[in-house]
Curated annotation (Swiss-Prot):
Any Pfam family hit: PTS_IIB
GO MF annotation: an example: protein-N(PI)-phosphohistidine-sugar phosphotransferase activity
Keyword Calcium appears in the UniProt entry: no
Domain PTS EIIB type-3: 3-88
Organism: Aeromonas hydrophila
Catalytic reaction(s) noted: D-cellobiose(out) + N(pros)-phospho-L-histidyl-[protein] = 6-phospho-beta-D-glucosyl-(1->4)-D-glucose(in) + L-histidyl-[protein]
Listed GO CC annotations: cytoplasm
Keywords for this protein: Cytoplasm, Kinase, Phosphoprotein, Phosphotransferase system, Sugar transport, Transferase, Transport
Name recorded for this polypeptide: PTS system cellobiose-specific EIIB component
Amino acid sequence: MEKKRIYLFCSAGMSTSLLVSKMKAQAEKYDVPVLIDAYPETLAGEKGQDADLVLLGPQIAYMLPEIQQQLPGKPVEVIDTLLYGKVD
């Protein structure tokens, strides 16, 4: 089975890096076939083309319409602020 690509985009990176690590650990634990990576928001239009799912950190939620426009047909969602803050 081909792995799905989940790409997270944010402005700072530290919290997102922690979240990516936890997501990768859970995917491995439950044998979920995904590749998860994080990038700065400046690469959303470029890197997002290769993603199956694009997640945005809450600090760049204001960019949702712009990124959706750059990635027509791609699912783009903002990570819930509470879950993001808990790195859960």
